[in-house]
């Protein structure tokens, strides 16, 4: 059974190297999806952190605030919690930036592979989602 239109034949041979490139493309797509999901979670966490920072600033400075460390909550002064939240926000910003860099690298490699594979296979291959 052929998937080409009737009367059209596929004369393109798939070499081992071509198959390796197709497999790499598939792996990169899966990695990109995982990074996109992680990036979404980190951005959401950053939003929550920003919201909490704004709320903490409204609290009286002498009032102790519960701050989550691992699985437990400890009481800290408002100023220390604010400083810790700033450190956490900076850590998240760095993580988001790293993930975005990875995503850009994957996108550039995907574009290169698309160009190579479409040049060889033309309409005989579909690399779009």
Curated annotation (Swiss-Prot):
Q: Name one GO molecular function term.
A: tubulin binding
* Spans through the membrane: none
Q: Which domain of life is it from?
A: Eukaryota
Signal peptide as annotated in the record: none
- GO process annotations (BP): cytoplasm protein quality control by the ubiquitin-proteasome system; positive regulation of transcription elongation by RNA polymerase II; protein folding; tubulin complex assembly
The record's section on InterPro entries has: PFD_beta-like, PFDN4, Prefoldin
- GO cellular component annotations, sorted alphabetically? cytoplasm; prefoldin complex
Chain positions found as N-acetylmethionine: 1
Query: One Pfam family this chain carries?
Result: Prefoldin_2
Chloroplast recorded as keyword: no
Quote the CDD domains the UniProt record gives.
Prefoldin_4
Q: Please verify whether the record's keywords include GTP-binding.
A: no
**Key words, A-Z:** Acetylation, Chaperone
Described by its record, this protein's role is as follows: Binds specifically to cytosolic chaperonin (c-CPN) and transfers target proteins to it. Binds to nascent polypeptide chain and promotes folding in an environment in which there are many competing pathways for nonnative proteins.
Q: Family, per the entry?
A: Belongs to the prefoldin subunit beta family.
Q: How does it assemble?
A: Heterohexamer of two PFD-alpha type and four PFD-beta type subunits.
Additional observations: Present with 7470 molecules/cell in log phase SD medium.
Name of protein: Prefoldin subunit 4
Native source organism of the sequence: Saccharomyces cerevisiae (strain ATCC 204508 / S288c) (Baker's yeast)
């Amino acid at each position: 059974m052929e998937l080409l239109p009737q009367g059209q034949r596929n004369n393109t041979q798939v070499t081992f190297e071509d198959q390796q490139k197709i497999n790499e493309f598939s792996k990169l797509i899966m990695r990109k999806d995982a990074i996109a999901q992680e990036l979404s979670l980190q951005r959401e966490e950053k939003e929550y952190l920003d919201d909490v920072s704004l709320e903490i600033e409204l609290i009286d400075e002498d009032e102790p605030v519960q701050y989550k460390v691992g699985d437990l909550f400890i009481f800290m002064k408002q100023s220390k919690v604010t400083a810790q939240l700033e450190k956490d926000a900076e850590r998240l910003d760095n993580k988001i930036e790293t993930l975005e860099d990875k995503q850009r690298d994957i996108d550039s490699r995907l574009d290169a592979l698309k160009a190579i594979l479409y040049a060889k296979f033309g309409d005989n291959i579909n690399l779009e989602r």
